[in-house]
Amino acid sequence: MSRLSHQDLRRGFRELIASNSCYHTASVFDPMSARIAADLGFEVGILGGSVASLQVLAAPDFALITLSEFAEQATRIGRVAQLPVIADADHGYGNALNVMRTVVELERAGIAALTIEDTLLPAQFGRKSTDLISVAEGVGKIRAALEARVDPELAIIARTNAGILPVQEIISRTQQYERAGADAICMVGIRDFEQLEQISEHLSVPLMLVTYGNPALRDDARLAELGVKIAVDGHAAYFAAIKATYDCLREQRQIFTQASDLSATELAHTYTQPEEYIVWAKEFMSVKE
């Protein structure tokens, strides 16, 4: 059986974002899930940073995973993936020079596209975790990513948080990332089509939205009209896998108490122990809630 090469998959991703349709991502977190997603007909998958942290570290999404750990998981997926996979590369694991290293490692892993976000990560001493870096630094990261890639088919996607910025600032940021050469713009936190339309009319590159299933954005035809080619609804498959594992093991142990009947969200919270990290952040980093 013929297999698609990494470059074939990257070309395939380019075709998706050049089309007139909006495609929803499958959450892929290991080789098996990548094969399942492709077999079920998904056109594109995504390895989420939060999911990688859960899968590799059993840790909450506090930017604790390292580039090496993330790239190793991406490589495992890349060995078998027969659909284009987007890597959520967070902040590029450091400054612009770290971003270059990130691109090198993820390109070798076989990733078709990667997002670099402008959130100030990891959380800084005395700063909120939602703070953003300056536009100038964000532009530098995108330019560095483009410089580092060897295969021009690898898509570099600039990501920003539209949920915490005024519309005009979102427009300004994303326009500058576009001018820096980003192949697409990813936004998280878009509220509705009105806000999306205000922003999209100022951009010419394809858009990617992290919607987390926002019901106000459930119209694929309208998303496509506004330039959205990729929609990320979340990572339900991963959380369903956690739930299935827990329920299977619970049944083996014959534990059927009401207190043990936990939802996937409750399980993730229980076993990643975020309270510990919050306490440590307050104690060692002066981070206020």
Swiss-Prot record:
<dbReference type="InterPro" id="IPR040442">
    <property type="entry name" value="Pyrv_kinase-like_dom_sf"/>
</dbReference>
<protein>
    <recommendedName>
        <fullName>Oxaloacetate decarboxylase</fullName>
        <ecNumber>4.1.1.112</ecNumber>
    </recommendedName>
</protein>
<dbReference type="GO" id="GO:0042866">
    <property type="term" value="P:pyruvate biosynthetic process"/>
</dbReference>
<dbReference type="GO" id="GO:0006107">
    <property type="term" value="P:oxaloacetate metabolic process"/>
</dbReference>
<comment type="subunit">
    <text>Homotetramer; dimer of dimers.</text>
</comment>
<keyword id="KW-0460">Magnesium</keyword>
<dbReference type="GO" id="GO:0019629">
    <property type="term" value="P:propionate catabolic process, 2-methylcitrate cycle"/>
</dbReference>
<keyword id="KW-0210">Decarboxylase</keyword>
<dbReference type="GO" id="GO:0046421">
    <property type="term" value="F:methylisocitrate lyase activity"/>
</dbReference>
<feature type="binding site">
    <location>
        <position position="88"/>
    </location>
    <ligand>
        <name>Mg(2+)</name>
    </ligand>
</feature>
<dbReference type="Pfam" id="PF13714">
    <property type="entry name" value="PEP_mutase"/>
</dbReference>
<dbReference type="InterPro" id="IPR015813">
    <property type="entry name" value="Pyrv/PenolPyrv_kinase-like_dom"/>
</dbReference>
<dbReference type="InterPro" id="IPR039556">
    <property type="entry name" value="ICL/PEPM"/>
</dbReference>
<keyword id="KW-0479">Metal-binding</keyword>
<feature type="binding site">
    <location>
        <position position="235"/>
    </location>
    <ligand>
        <name>substrate</name>
    </ligand>
</feature>
<comment type="function">
    <text>Catalyzes the decarboxylation of oxaloacetate into pyruvate. Seems to play a role in maintaining cellular concentrations of bicarbonate and pyruvate.</text>
</comment>
<dbReference type="GO" id="GO:0008948">
    <property type="term" value="F:oxaloacetate decarboxylase activity"/>
</dbReference>
<feature type="binding site">
    <location>
        <position position="159"/>
    </location>
    <ligand>
        <name>substrate</name>
    </ligand>
</feature>
<comment type="similarity">
    <text>Belongs to the isocitrate lyase/PEP mutase superfamily. Oxaloacetate decarboxylase family.</text>
</comment>
<keyword id="KW-0456">Lyase</keyword>
<dbReference type="GO" id="GO:0000287">
    <property type="term" value="F:magnesium ion binding"/>
</dbReference>
<feature type="binding site">
    <location>
        <position position="50"/>
    </location>
    <ligand>
        <name>substrate</name>
    </ligand>
</feature>
<dbReference type="InterPro" id="IPR023687">
    <property type="entry name" value="Oxaloacetate_deCOase_bac"/>
</dbReference>
